[in-house]
Every structure is written in C-alpha cells, then in structure tokens.
C-alpha cells in the first residue's frame, strides 16, 4: 500500500502431508500410524469460524467399537414359514374381497350358503400364485434337506425323500396349472403372470453374485473389472434371478478392523456391494409377492364379477411395505448394521468447504496412503475439504463414500427407519379398521395386523436393547 510500512517477511508454511506415505499404507493391528514431523501453525481465523486442529489432535487415536448383545433371531426355515403364512393371509383376505357373497340374506334374495363364491374361483391361478409365494420356503426346505451333514442311513433316506417329494410335488403342480391355464386363457393373460420376471432383467443387470465370497476373499480390482465385462445374456441373468429368489443362510461378513487405508476402502467397497444386493433382494421380493397377491387374482376375474379396485391397490401397498420391513429386518440384522457402522467409522468423511473461508489456513495435498485426523483441511481436485470423521481414509470427491458414512455413521439409522415405517403402517391399519364399514374389510385388516404386530414387537425390542447398548460408554473389542 502506498505510504504504508511493510511488515516483516512472512513465514513460509510447509505443505507436507500429515503422514508418512511410506509407513501409513502397511499399518495393521500392531501399529498405529501417527502424524509425526508436522510443525504447522494456523493463522488467525476467528472471522471465518474455521480453525486448524492443534498439534495434539493431529495424532490418529485408535477407535473403540461398542459391543452389542447377541439378540435372538429366528431360524431361516422358521422365518420363511412365517413370511409365507403372512402372504397366505393376505391372499386369503383378497379372495374374500373379490368373491364375497351375501350369505346372510333371506331366501327371497339371491341365495348363497357359503361366504365365498367358490365356483367362480380359478384354482389353477390360485395354485400358481401359492407356488410363487412359497418359492422362498421351498428353497429353504430343499437347502435344509441338502445340508444334513453326517447322518445315519435312515436320516439320509428321509432327507432325500423329503427333497424329492417337495421338488416333484411343486414341479408337477406348477406344470399342471400352466398347461390348464393355456387351455382356458389367452396368451395375453398368461403374459401378465410373467410380467415381473421380464422387468427384473433390465432392473438387475447382474453379472456376478458378490455375496458369495467372504471378506477374507474380497475380489480385487482386476476381478471386479472382469466380472463387469462378463457376458450378460438372457440365460445368465435368469440364473441370477432364480438364485436371487432362493433364500440364503450364509454367515454374515466379518469386520477386518484394519488400519491400512487401501484395505479399509476395499472393505467398504465390498460391503457396499453386499448391502446393495440385500436391498435389491428386499425390493424385488416384496414387489413380486405384492404383485401376485393383489394384482394377479383380479386379472383373471370374469368381466361380470365386481371387486373393489381401490382396496386391491391399497392391499398391494400394504403387502409390499410389510414384506419389505420383514425382509429388511431379516437380511439386515443388528450385527450386520453394526458391521457397517464400524466400517463407516474407519472410512471417515470429508466436508467440502468454501476456499475463501480457509485461504489463510494450512491446507495439505490429499494422499491416498495417509490416514487423516479430524479437522484437517486438504486439497483434492481443485477443491478444499475438511475431515469430519474420527480419522478419514475416504476419497474426498467420491460421493459413494460420503453416502456410506452418512447412512451408517449412526448404527441405529436402519432400525429407526424400519420401526417408523412399521409403526406408521400399523397406525394406518388400526385407523382403517376402526373406520371400516364393510365386513370383509374388517376381517382383512384384523388378520393382516397380526403379522405386523409380531414384526413391530421384534423391531421395538431390538431398538430398545441396542439404544441402551450404544448409549453406554464404548467398550473396546
């Protein structure tokens, strides 16, 4: 400035990273990568609201994970039996809505000795719908009979006979129903049965089942690239669709709890694929079950038959939401959500800040081999980011890392969402039950509520227990 007096020469602040790239990448359980050799001072930034972390905070402190109790869970076969029973109840109440009669009328009116018009029901459609709804239960029975282990000769014969009887009976009933439907209905009506399976192919776009290998055998980048370049022909996708709807009782992944940034990012990548697969399984299974419960029976109703279309759409939403909550609770148990929470805590998160607010603060060049402590400012792709997590190895510009940390930083987030959805659904069903004036609506809602009560009880129990467990002081593993 003209006429002004220049101050002393300003100190040249170094731009060295917070960790030694040669030692941070190979850290494991035995050693903690500490931030050494950093002698940086932050300039005064009281006007901007940002501050550089003190020197003591620039040392990565090991995480202490909270131990959660082992909550009781239903066996896989028992769970599939309960889910099939809930679907049968929904299908039964929908048939009441379609084929109800006025059996209480006096003989002067059109007489009816039964509560349903059984002569109008197409039992071939009913058989086919029941088999589709029981697909997971059939797969669970066959898998349970195939995994008998070491057993005596009579037990082995019994398991083989059970497997043969289930598969033969299911296949014979399915083929017989399809043949009889071809004789009595048009080809266009039969395409309505295959509509969900045709929609799966563009929706799934699967090339590999990532849930089969364990975390100890995580696929590397070359394997993932070769999987993505693999052929996705029609038969290959159909194979994955059938495998997708078969229940899996495989053990949950385990948490590596490593300190290498590359291994942490690889673990998060695998868990992200596994979580997306489980969510996709929940969505497609619930939509398929709701489709066959609510829409397939009304499509094969005769044109002279009257039914409540609004109730069919409402039943579709209720069945899809109930099935989604029940399947999510089974496929994403508390131990699995805790595993995702631990991985998110190791991954960390970055928050994008305005460069004008931190122009007078120390900014480091982000390096993928480093483990950055909380509050550090880094430069990445011409942007400035601030470390938010306990320690951070995520890529600042990777949106998937940000979403993973945001969604699983709270270990109770998934459980809170499920509990809220189930509570809202039960409240709506109770309100509809109290305000209903038709007898078949009253019976339908009363029967459907029983399954939702049991699911809500388990969700509320897990929420109370885990809420108290996470509220206590973290206990080291």
From Swiss-Prot:
Chief location bin: endoplasmic reticulum
Membrane-spanning segments: 76-96, 114-134, 158-182, 187-207, 281-301, 414-434, 440-460
Key words of the record: Endoplasmic reticulum, Glycoprotein, Membrane, Transmembrane, Transmembrane helix
Protein name, entry field: Transmembrane protein 39B
InterPro entries: Uncharacterised_TMEM39 (IPR019397)
Glycosylation, residue list: 9
PANTHER family: FI21814P1, TRANSMEMBRANE PROTEIN 39B
UniProt-annotated stretches for the region Disordered: 25-54
Biological role stated in the UniProt entry: May protect the cells against DNA damage caused by exposure to the cold-warming stress and facilitates tissue damage repair during the recovery phase.
Localization, UniProt: Endoplasmic reticulum membrane
Family affiliation: Belongs to the TMEM39 family.
Any GO CC annotation of this UniProt entry: membrane
Membrane topology classification: Multi-pass membrane protein
Compositionally biased intervals (Low complexity): 35-54
The organism of origin for this protein: Xenopus laevis
Domain of life: Eukaryota
Presence of the UniProt keyword Transferase in the record: no
